[in-house]
Amino acid sequence: MRMFRITACVPSQTRIRTQRELQNTYFTKLVPYDNWFREQQRIMKMGGKIVKVELATGRPGTNAGLA
């Protein structure tokens, strides 16, 4: 199954002391190829930024279907 390994940065939900002080959360997750658009919309809606996207498969050396 084709998967994307995405690294994204989203602002945290909790406000710390002042409104200006924001804390960002970085995370990496595997997203199925078919759900990529939905996940991208979710991150953007939260005010986040996608840092890196890689095509990943479950096992090393597996053909990812790219020519």
From Swiss-Prot:
The keyword Acetylation does not apply. Keywords: Antenna complex, Membrane, Photosynthesis, Phycobilisome, Thylakoid. One of its GO terms (biological process) is photosynthesis. Gene3D superfamilies: Allophycocyanin linker chain (domain). It is a peripheral membrane protein. Its main location: membrane. Pfam families: CpcD (PF01383). Rod linker protein, associated with allophycocyanin. Linker polypeptides determine the state of aggregation and the location of the disk-shaped phycobiliprotein units within the phycobilisome and modulate their spectroscopic properties in order to mediate a directed and optimal energy transfer. This is Phycobilisome 7.8 kDa linker polypeptide, allophycocyanin-associated, core. It comes from Synechocystis sp. (strain PCC 6714).
